[in-house]
């Protein structure tokens, strides 16, 4: 049964991070009190706005600082320029852009309007979609990269180079532009209930394109990539169980297994953080639920915040799971304004060289072309 378009149905909601922008009048917590005069605001709405602002502020601070440090460390230290770290740079760039939009969204929640104009509306919404697609595409390529390193070590010598990783990153952004650019075009600001709303305006019939967009994003930004990642790690698990020594060197094997484990943890964190909002939006779209229910509204905002939290979680995971990132973070914090001291970094690296071979100490020379 086709849903009947309501008044103003040509103005449809964005899909994920700004989903609440579409519901300023439908969701009591996101806009004016539905039962009160214009401009009235319930205590629960104000409390939710304050909680969202506090959470977004923390995520923004940790996410921006952490991801900038990750990118700076990879750019600054030659030994960090491995194929895996080039993908991590791409992920950090997408996460940094996403967290940079949080101050604007916090202001929107507090002010109950979008005061920043249509240009920033287009930028914020398109960045959300760029982050969603570039993140999952990059994680998928990282999983394929680990599969090649573990299961096809000879082919890895040619495929797993920083130059090819950079080219793949560019292709990922071009591919994500297939979604990001249309979102930028469709993003508009419109007056509604005495406020300004930043939202997507789909072509007619709007309800149809809105539903198709949500389902396609769910499939191609979540289900299909997760299936590919699952297959890659399933094949890697079989390989790791059947072969005691993958590379002929115990140190290189430790490096392979450790970096593979790190990528798996990062992928797992992404799934945990993004699965709720993907599922919630599909349920919101296909199931008749009470969108004014305070619990439904709170669940929506919690799922959105969880997706953003993933952007600040990744740098923390790198610091805990990879000794080279940990050392680079320490080095950058010790000398934030000066040039890096190669000798101190070399000493720190050599101190653990007998115990581990990491992405910071590639086996094929300073270029790190096919390092783990």
UniProtKB/Swiss-Prot annotation:
GO BP term, example? G protein-coupled receptor signaling pathway
Q: What is its main location?
A: membrane
GO molecular function annotation: G protein-coupled enkephalin receptor activity; G protein-coupled opioid receptor activity; neuropeptide binding; receptor serine/threonine kinase binding
Bilayer-crossing residues are: 48-75, 86-110, 123-144, 164-186, 207-238, 262-284, 300-321
Residues carrying a glycan: 18, 33
Q: Which domain of life is it from?
A: Eukaryota
Query: Region (Disordered) spans which residues?
Result: 340-372
Extracellular compartment ranges equal 1-47, 111-122, 187-206, 285-299
Return the GO cellular component terms, semicolon-separated. Answer: axon terminus; dendrite membrane; neuron projection; neuronal dense core vesicle; plasma membrane; postsynaptic density membrane; presynaptic membrane; spine apparatus
Compositional bias annotation for Basic and acidic residues = 347-357
User: What is its membrane topology?
Assistant: Multi-pass membrane protein
Question: Cellular location of this protein?
Answer: Cell membrane
Q: How is it modified post-translationally? A: N-glycosylated. Ubiquitinated. A basal ubiquitination seems not to be related to degradation. Ubiquitination is increased upon formation of OPRM1:OPRD1 oligomers leading to proteasomal degradation; the ubiquitination is diminished by RTP4.
As annotated in Swiss-Prot or TrEMBL, what is the tissue specificity of this protein?
A: Detected in oocytes (at protein level). Detected in brain cortex, hypothalamus, hippocampus and olfactory bulb. Detected in oocytes.
Q: Which Gene3D superfamilies match?
A: Rhodopsin 7-helix transmembrane proteins
Pfam families given in the database record: 7tm_1
Membrane topology, Cytoplasmic segments: 76-85, 145-163, 239-261, 322-372
Q: List the disulfide bonds.
A: 121-198
Subunit details for this protein? Answer: May form homooligomers. Forms a heterodimer with OPRM1. Interacts with GPRASP1. Interacts with RTP4; the interaction promotes cell surface localization of the OPRD1-OPRM1 heterodimer.
Chain's role: G-protein coupled receptor that functions as a receptor for endogenous enkephalins and for a subset of other opioids. Ligand binding causes a conformation change that triggers signaling via guanine nucleotide-binding proteins (G proteins) and modulates the activity of down-stream effectors, such as adenylate cyclase. Signaling leads to the inhibition of adenylate cyclase activity. Inhibits neurotransmitter release by reducing calcium ion currents and increasing potassium ion conductance. Plays a role in the perception of pain and in opiate-mediated analgesia.
What is the protein name given in its UniProt record? Answer: Delta-type opioid receptor
**What organism does this protein naturally occur in?**
Homo sapiens (Human)
């Amino acid at each position: 049964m086709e849903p009947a378009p309501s008044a103003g149905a040509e103005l449809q909601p964005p899909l994920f991070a700004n989903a609440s922008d579409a519901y300023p009048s439908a969701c009591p917590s996101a806009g004016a009190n539905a039962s009160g005069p214009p401009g009235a605001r319930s205590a629960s709405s104000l409390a939710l706005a304050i909680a969202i602002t506090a959470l977004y502020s923390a995520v923004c601070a940790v996410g921006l600082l952490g991801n900038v440090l990750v990118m700076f460390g990879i750019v600054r230290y030659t030994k960090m320029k491995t194929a895996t770290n080039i993908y991590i740079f791409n992920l950090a760039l997408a996460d940094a852009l996403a967290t940079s939009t949080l101050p604007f969204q916090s202001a929107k929640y507090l002010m109950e309007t979008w005061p920043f104009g249509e240009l920033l509306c287009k930028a914020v919404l398109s960045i959300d979609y760029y982050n969603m697609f570039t993140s999952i595409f990059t994680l998928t390529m990282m999983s394929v990269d680990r599969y090649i390193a573990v299961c096809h070590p000879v082919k890895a010598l040619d495929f797993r180079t920083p130059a090819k990783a950079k080219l793949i990153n560019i292709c990922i952004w071009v591919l994500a532009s297939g979604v990001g650019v249309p979102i930028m075009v469709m993003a508009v600001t419109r007056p509604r209930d005495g406020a300004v709303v930043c939202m997507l305006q789909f072509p007619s019939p709007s309800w149809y394109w809105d539903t198709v967009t949500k389902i396609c994003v769910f499939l191609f930004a979540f289900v299909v990539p997760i299936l590919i990642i699952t297959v890659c790690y399933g094949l890697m698990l079989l390989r790791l169980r059947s072969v005691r020594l993958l590379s002929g060197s115990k140190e290189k094997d430790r490096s392979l297994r450790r970096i593979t484990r790190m990528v798996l943890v990062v992928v797992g964190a992404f799934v945990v953080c993004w699965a709720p909002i993907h599922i919630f939006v599909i349920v919101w779209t296909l199931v008749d639920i009470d969108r004014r229910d305070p619990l439904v509204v709170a669940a929506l905002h919690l799922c959105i915040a969880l997706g953003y939290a993933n952007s600040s979680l990744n740098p923390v995971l790198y610091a805990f799971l990879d000794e080279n990132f940990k050392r680079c973070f320490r080095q950058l914090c010790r000398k934030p304004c000066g040039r890096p001291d190669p000798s101190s970094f070399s000493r720190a690296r050599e101190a653990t060289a007998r115990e581990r071979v990491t992405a910071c100490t590639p086996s094929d020379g300073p270029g790190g072309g096919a390092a783990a």
